[in-house]
Amino acid sequence: IHSNSTPLVGIQDNIITDINLVHKSISENIYLIEQKLNVVFKDTVLVIDNFRFSLINLSGFKKLNGSQLKKENITYLLNSLKLNISEIDIEKSIIHIFSSKYLLDKKRIENLPIGLFGDLYSQELSFFLLNNNDLKNIYEIFNKCNLRIRKIMSKSFVEGANLINNNF
């Protein structure tokens, strides 16, 4: 895996101010990496720290009344929380969702408790959001580079996840 960090021109105060300069800088760096590795990239996972991400934590719950927690229950809960996010902040898009806590009958569970029986299931989720226009600009730049973005992540989130993983 290759990592490259290059100061970008055309970005000021976390806003793309010149899409052509940003595209030129990124495409030149991609070309150099492709030449060095002798490959042509078709898609990418983008880790960025030049933009201001918003973070919203929400909890959702499902009354089970002694029944089994099913995948459909969790899917419904996730979709309803995503809908809440889109109603709360229509100018931003969800970039990443992180499950931070699972509770079954008020007891913390380490893994998704699909298949377990209980009376009440609750889940806390953290939503990372990015401004819609910033997101459109990012996609436009990488489309011009003939790269499909598979995922966008915040650099601070990735560093935090690595720190947690290295400590366990």
Labelled PLM ranges:
Residues I1-D43, I48-F168:
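Nucleotide/phosphate-binding catalytic cleft detector across ATP-hydrolyzing
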